[in-house]
Amino acid sequence: MNTKRKICVVTGTRAEYGLLQPIMKAIKEDKLLELQVAVTGMHLSPEFGLTYKTIEEDDFEISEKIEILLSSDTSIGVAKAIGLATISFSETLNRLKPDFIMILGDRFELLAAAQAALVSRIPIVHLAGGDVTEGAFDEAIRHSITKMSQLHFVTNKESEKRVHQLGEDPESIHLVGNPGLDHLNSLKLMGKNELEKSLRYSFKSKNILVTFHSVTLDNAPSVNSFSALLEALDGLGEDIGIIFTRPNADTEGRQLIKMLDKYVEDRSNCIVYTSLGQLRYLSTVALVDVVVGNSSSGILEAPSLKTATVNIGDRQKGRLRADSIIDCEPITENIKESIQQAFKLDCSTVVNPYGDGNTTERVLKVLREINHPERLIKKHFYDIDFEYS
């Protein structure tokens, strides 16, 4: 009789999988736990690189593939995808019958998974709750998932306070750090020659890694901000090497991809990838001079690799910042000046505020020691005493 505790890990994007991978590996190898993997979202889209194959190449068995993406990336298309995902996840959870479902972050497909788990009475383990990203509707999704979750693994002290403010019992909140940093303690990054061969790209004297996603709560279209970024990159000159990774499948995402592909076509110093994969991505971050854009990786991982970040606009507004991060407005001249400033930044002594790279063991310790997961379902609102004037 199988008495292992079943943990169903949900992943919908390449970036999120990179953060979850150390925990997934540890669950798979643990004698008391059984790993289930539910793959959805961009992982299953040819347009975004069919990155579920990376999960299989990492020797994980995929328990269920849940296709939800529509051809439209308008707000209506995304809303319909959430509905389809909720239906699909309810069927998946009924088949897999996990003891816990594990979710990281704030993507719209994760909201659907959480809703399905909530009504199916399956306890939710939420990683990175309480973080703040004021420029995207992901902010509201993250806090919504917190209220549906029974266990909270937070990345920093400020996030711990926010989850408590949302009425969650302090005993259910565990400060563990950012799981993406665990790799940096064990992963052997690629050297310059090996990476150049793998990327089919020759590094210049100065190099930039660019990832720019749509900003879903911005009043101005994301294409305007992206256009300002591309103009700023042109102003740096052709002797700067630029490596792009494509945007996510968010509202306006496909418009940004079209702009990016057209831009790269005409410029010999630029190259674009749908997905670099975790090893190549982190190796690239470590070898370039600056990470540019509005991806969370510039905030969360780049400081540990001692690489400067130029963070554009409000997508990551509210997150803790290391000293290696320069914030700027999505205006061409501001972006250009910030990149030039970042080239001169010494990041050798930068400290990452998101942990020490030992998140996985902290998470597994809690999962092993929880008695009777089904008893976690019924929560009470944990009030905080406030003084009102």
Labelled PLM ranges:
Residues 303-349:
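Nucleotide-sugar donor-binding patch of glycosyltransferase catalytic domains
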